Amino acid sequence: MARLIDQFERLPGIGPRTAQRLALHLLNQPQEQIHQFADALLAARTQVGQCQTCFHLSADPECEICRNPERRNGVICVVADSRDLLALERTREFHGRYHVLGGLISPMDGIGPELLRVTELVQRISNEEISEVILALTPSVEGDTTSLYLGRLLKPFCSVSRIAYGLPMGSELEYADEVTLSRALEGRRPV
């Protein structure tokens, strides 16, 4: 049981207590259900790869988004990973294409632009006649570094913008940090 708990703890957002609860829950399930769970996990790992165009997770050579003829072709939204892409898709506000970088520039972790899918992004911009790139990267040192790098690299080819950052709905101004408030002021829009 300790091995199972240890494996669950390796998952993002799962602490020791949750890992133990998950392990106990699985051990109380019928053998057939545990086999189905294991089969689904193995099938996902072997059958799901990356879209050859945008690098989003896909069981096919091209993902659903890239195959969709109703998506706008001239706009690419750049994200760090598929989790960010899925979060944006849940809003149903963006109707263009995506490009998954595979991470963010982080010199402290030894991750430079050459380890990300930057070359592929530049190739897409020149091959697909992209007019705008929207950078939807995390508001962090790494996200800012990556945005600055990409902005400088891509501006000669197309319009480059970054999504606005500010206060989450329902939050109180007095509890917001200075950086968040500064960005909220910078990203203000007319009413």
From Swiss-Prot:
Toprim domain segment(s): 74-168
Domain of life assignment: Bacteria
Chain intervals annotated as zinc finger (C4-type): 51-66
InterPro entries: DNA_Rcmb_RecR, Rcmb_RecR, Rcmb_RecR_Znf, TOPRIM_dom, TOPRIM_RecR
SMART domains in UniProt: TOPRIM
Keywords: DNA damage, DNA recombination, DNA repair, Metal-binding, Zinc, Zinc-finger
Residues forming coiled coils: none
PROSITE patterns according to UniProt: TOPRIM
GO molecular function: DNA binding; zinc ion binding
Signal peptide: none
Entry's Gene Ontology BP terms: DNA recombination; DNA repair
Transmembrane in keyword set: no
Functional summary from the UniProt entry: May play a role in DNA repair. It seems to be involved in an RecBC-independent recombinational process of DNA repair. It may act with RecF and RecO.
NCBIfam families: recR
Family: Belongs to the RecR family.
Protein name per Swiss-Prot or TrEMBL: Recombination protein RecR
Organism per entry: Synechococcus sp. (strain CC9605)
